[in-house]
UniProtKB/Swiss-Prot annotation:
Name of the protein described by the UniProt record: 2-C-methyl-D-erythritol 4-phosphate cytidylyltransferase
Source species of the chain: Geobacillus kaustophilus (strain HTA426)
Example GO molecular function: 2-C-methyl-D-erythritol 4-phosphate cytidylyltransferase activity
Gene Ontology biological-process entries: isopentenyl diphosphate biosynthetic process, methylerythritol 4-phosphate pathway
Gene name of the record: ispD
InterPro entries from the UniProt entry: IspD, IspD/TarI, IspD/TarI_cytidylyltransf_bact, ISPD_synthase_CS, Nucleotide-diphossugar_trans
Catalytic activity, as annotated: 2-C-methyl-D-erythritol 4-phosphate + CTP + H(+) = 4-CDP-2-C-methyl-D-erythritol + diphosphate
Membership in a protein family: Belongs to the IspD/TarI cytidylyltransferase family. IspD subfamily.
Length: 228
């Protein structure tokens, strides 16, 4: 089944300390956002991309889309005050495919086969998210003193893209908007209205580039991909 994608690129990325939006940082000779968009650009099941940007950077994004010949970005939408508001703005710009994938622009390493697994699961269950099992020991703390060691056997680290039936994620966002609720991700809004969210086993290499150290990991992942 086909799908539309919302790609979020409006964040400030302060933790990267790059002096610019991290989406414009180069990774292997291409801007980060271009690498991310190309995953969807090259997937035949993706019919359309909505790119959510800071309005002050709109022209720069438009120049990148033209320079790198990215054809599937059909709309550039302004970001909101919070990530959730940015997603909501992106949802308003969709054309109406039954399934939508919502993705962080700073995750350039998602695999196409994972996109398809997520789409198939969203068709069946309504909502699906990629996640990886937590490897480290997790402790709950009060200040800098341990209160409890958490059983990690049921813990998952959640990634994007997150996939939804459009009608379901619209319902979830509208309910959150009316209640003034801010969730930590889009799936949490679906959970809030009592609907199931299916986990699809993700890939540890599908990292989100957040800090300068992540750029080093990203270069290593890119080198390994090029060697495949």
């Amino acid at each position: 089944m086909n799908y539309e994608a919302i790609v979020l690129a409006a964040g400030r990325g302060k933790r990267m300390n790059a002096g610019m939006n991290k989406q414009f940082l180069e990774l292997g000779g291409e801007p980060l956002i271009v690498r991310t968009l190309n995953v969807f650009e090259r997937d035949e099941r993706c019919t359309r991309i909505v790119l959510v940007v800071n309005p002050a950077e709109r022209s720069r994004f438009e120049q990148l889309l033209a320079r790198f010949r990215i054809q599937k970005v059909a709309a550039l939408t302004d970001g909101g005050e919070e990530r959730q508001h940015s997603v909501y703005n992106g949802l308003q710009a969709l054309a109406g495919e039954e399934i939508v994938l919502i993705h962080d622009g700073a995750r350039p390493f998602v695999r196409v086969h994972h996109l398809h697994e997520l789409v198939n699961a969203a068709v069946q269950y309504g909502a699906a998210i990629p996640a990886v099992r937590v490897k480290d020991t997790i402790k709950k703390a009060n200040g800098l003193f341990v209160e409890q060691t958490i059983d990690r056997s049921s813990l998952w680290a959640v990634q994007t893209p997150q996939a939804f039936r459009l009608s379901l994620i619209m319902e979830a966002h509208e309910a959150a908007k009316q209640a003034g609720y801010l969730g930590t991700d889009d799936a949490s809004l679906v959970e809030r209205i009592g609907k199931p969210v299916k986990i699809i086993e993700g890939d540890y290499r599908n990292i989100k580039l957040t800090t300068p150290e992540d750029l080093l990991f990203a270069e290593a992942i890119l080198a390994s991909r090029m060697a495949e």
